Amino acid sequence: MRHLLSLLVLLIASAALVSAVPAGSIITPQPPVEPVHLLSSQPSDPRRPWIRLRDWIIESIWGIEKPASRRFPLNDSPRNRSPPSRILARYGSDVVLRFSLRNHDEAEALAQAADILFLDVWASTPAFVDIRLAEEVIPSLLGLLPNSLQTAYTPLIDNLAERIYTTYPSKKPIGLEGQSGFASSSRPAPKFGDLFFHEYQPLSVIIPWMRLLASMFPSHVRMISVGVSYEGREIPALRLSAGSSTAASGPRKTIIVTGGSHAREWIGTSTVNHVMYTLITKYGKSKAVTRLLQDFDWIMIPTINPDGYVYTWETDRLWRKNRQRTSLRFCPGIDLDRAWGFEWDGGRTRANPCSENYAGDEPFEGMEAQQLAQWALNETQNNNADIVSFLDLHSYSQTILYPFSYSCSSIPPTLESLEELGLGLAKAIRYATHEIYDVTSACEGIVTASAADNNPGRFFPIGGNSGGSALDWFYHQVHATYSYQIKLRDRGSYGFLLPSEHIIPTGKEIYNVVLKLGSFLIGGDSFDVDWESELFDLSKDESDLDSRYSKSNDRSPAYLHNANGPLPNIDEDEDKEWVMVEEEDYTDDDDDDDDDDEEEEEEEEDTYWATEHTYEFRRRR
């Protein structure tokens, strides 16, 4: 009854909200918005209209009084200051709770309560469910649960605003030193790769960086687009290949690696970047990597959801879906991992576009999913490609999932091979960092209503998967025999807000996955390569991705190039080295003047450094 009343109030209130949304017939990409401007503004209520409506429903129906503003201690932040007002206003009372489940009835009760209250389910397994909600909603949630669940929870994140703030890049880069136009002679210059992966990077930095890699390594790297987003942004990718594809040689075996389907899962985007950078820079030096690029085309797509990814940097760090308009214009967005055409089951969420799992009103309504599918089909039908593997990186829970996602009653015909390779991938990850990744079918953990066939309007995806997934589509439609969805770090301590120091270790884990996958596919023809010795090995403490960047050089660089400008022509035969620095204004004053530094820091507002700085790439002779 409460659920029906909630929906009734929602429909009545939606009319007023819809009329308040400006109409527009043409969708054009918006110019980049500096987060510092957003954070420094003082909106009367920065919550999205849907969130305001949801909170009003809860307060009205369950009689919850609006709590006083939550107070954050200034010393809690690693930056020694509280989050900016915009973050506090949006997330100030939000927490993440983990509920422990003991049986199906408890899972079903929690599913129903989360559905009624429109809660954001972060992750779920047959043993636990992580839910994000406002503190003031906790009494309402507990009131809808059986007694056994009312004490079966623990707080995972009790200061969500603070945790969100720490995921954005710090104001100052790490390890940058020296004067403008010169590399330091006292120690090696900062390593290009390490510097880039010290922080999460916005799309405005990632795309110029990809262009630079394509220009630096034209022999085996080419920048391509696999489609256009709903707001008109290109979906960028790098094609890594050192082989040739002709009709005489037969179809070119192709492996696709994607990230960022869900916008808030930044670690997926950063991991794709790290893996492709490692493959690019190790080509010609590593026998294993050289063999991989000779035998396969690698399509590396950092994010298939550029609109959503940009939105997480500019407005809402925890945005999940794309930014496509829906039937409820104040609830935009389609879940791109439920929008694919194979066994699409979007009827379950069709009535609620505000759901984080909303799959659209029909298969492939999600623009970016449609674009990637069309590109993949065109590759196989017209460009002599044979897509043999698909790796889809998500977060979180440290799990390797194989098809099928839509149903456990359907057994994939290559199940034995999928399980064998999946266990091998998990072993390769342990080799890199000693982290444990579980291996299971993507369907396991799906919890539906006990009479799902008679009540198709509701479901609770414990494992985060269902019909319409990219995993199932690539496996079934284009016959990518070895298709996996890999949920990256961690197991819940940080959730979607994984600290940036995990970027490089996670990248090493998936690099090992790529090596293991390649060696498995090449099989008996790879005796000339010692694959195991090429893996990242924690016991060896490999701190360098490429030893060439550890050489010191006391000569001033003769070439400067701004990453956001046009790329130069580079002679691939020249043996040059590159380092990355930040463009800054330097003076002859002592840079170590502590008094000046302290005074400057007091005057500065909190900013997101990565969206304000400009990278330069310096060529060393």
From Swiss-Prot:
Classification via SMART domains: Zn_pept
Role noted for this protein: Inactive carboxypeptidase that may play a role in cell wall organization and biogenesis.
Name under which the protein is recorded: Inactive metallocarboxypeptidase ecm14
Propeptide stretch(es), residue numbers: 21-171
Disulphide bridges: C331-C354
UniProtKB keywords: Cell wall biogenesis/degradation, Disulfide bond, Glycoprotein, Metal-binding, Secreted, Signal, Vacuole, Zinc
Domain of life: Eukaryota
Native source organism of the sequence: Aspergillus niger (strain ATCC MYA-4892 / CBS 513.88 / FGSC A1513)
Any one GO CC term of the record: vacuole
UniProt biased composition (Basic and acidic residues): 544-554
PANTHER family in the record: INACTIVE METALLOCARBOXYPEPTIDASE ECM14, PROTEASE FAMILY M14 CARBOXYPEPTIDASE A,B
Coarse class of the protein's main subcellular location: other
Sugar attachment sites: N378
Similarity comment: Belongs to the peptidase M14 family.
Signal peptide: 1-20
Stretches the record annotates as Disordered: 544-621
Positions with a binding annotation for substrate: H262, A263, R264, E265, R320, D337, R338, S395, Y396
CDD domains: M14_CP_A-B_like
A Pfam match: Peptidase_M14
